[in-house]
């Protein structure tokens, strides 16, 4: 993931200085899409393994998140 982000930044800097070729522009779009999908997947994974508890120790995880967690457990 670090190398993807490094290349995205490298292309962005080049775009500002001298512009990108058509191939570089396509590569930049593909890398950004790949990075975004990876980031969203990681965030989903984190959220699906999260439990929210108030100061009194009561589970206050939103119902939609609890439903998604149950569906995930059932699909395994």
From Swiss-Prot:
Family: Belongs to the UPF0291 family.
Record bears the keyword Coiled coil: no
InterPro entries, per database record: DUF896
Protein's recorded name: UPF0291 protein BCE_1981
Any one Gene Ontology cellular component term annotated for this protein: cytoplasm
Family annotation (NCBIfam families): PRK01631.1
Cytoplasm in keyword set: yes
Chief location category: cytoplasm
Top-level taxon: Bacteria
Localization of this protein: Cytoplasm
Keywords, in A-Z order: Cytoplasm
